[in-house]
Design a protein with these regions (language model features):
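NTP-dependent nucleotidyl-transfer catalytic core
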Residues: 1-197
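Conserved small/polar residues in nucleotide/adenosyl-binding loops
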Residues: 203-209
Length: 212
């Protein structure tokens, strides 16, 4: 049976971007495929250093997913930090990932460009976590070897990096990972906000569980 995988980073209150880009597609796919859904609490450490805030965000996002119709009987729903094998795989994949590939990651390039604009050293304030974020995302995905991964256009590059790393692993050792295919909803470019206006950036539009 084919499978899909979706995760949400636990950095705050769920917003409309989470709903249209992750929660809604994941629930839809769970009716067709074996689904892996997770709370990406390790990823949140790049932006949030408060463990209480991460825990509260995890609870809110989990509650929102359930309130929006997630059937845990048809899906494996888990917290990233509760699967230690992900970090083990993260190290293995980091040995497969060329630095040049990670240099081209959008988040890292944006941080470098901002430093240049502010006349700072290129890597000023940039953590290794931010730089290697795509490798951990690759480990998240390849740990469960799904066929499909719903992604927004801004995350498509990370899935391409995952495919590149998986392909290199397969060629170095043996064919072990299938190359995950993206599911991209082209309609997500614009969303009608709660104020009735079209918006491209909707991460500030929070989503109470009663809205689902």
């Amino acid at each position: 049976m084919d499978s899909s995988l979706t995760g949400i980073t636990t950095t705050g209150t769920p917003h409309l971007g989470n709903y249209v880009g992750a929660i809604k597609p994941a629930i839809k796919l769970s009716k067709k495929f074996k689904s892996y859904l997770f709370l990406a609490d390790y990823h949140s450490l790049i932006k949030v250093n408060d463990p209480i805030a991460v825990k509260e965000s995890s609870m809110k996002i989990a509650a929102t997913w359930l309130a929006c119709g997630l059937d845990s009987k048809n899906s494996l729903f888990y917290r990233q930090s509760k699967v230690p094998q992900i970090l083990e795989l993260n190290w293995i994949l980091s040995c497969m990932a060329p630095k040049g590939l990670l240099n081209r990651a959008h988040a890292y390039k944006a941080a470098v460009d901002l430093n240049k604009e502010n006349k700072n050293d290129d890597d000023y304030g940039i953590s290794h976590g931010l730089f290697s974020y795509p490798v951990l995302m690759s480990a998240d995905i390849l740990m469960f070897n799904p066929k499909y991964v719903p992604v927004g256009k801004d995350q498509k590059q990370h899935l391409e990096i995952t495919r590149d790393i998986a392909d290199k692993f397969n060629k170095t050792y043996k064919i072990f990972f299938q190359l995950p295919e993206p599911i991209i909803d082209e309609s997500l470019d614009l969303l009608i906000g709660t104020d009735g206006r079209k918006t491209v950036s909707y991460t500030h539009l929070t989503l109470p569980t009663t809205s689902c």
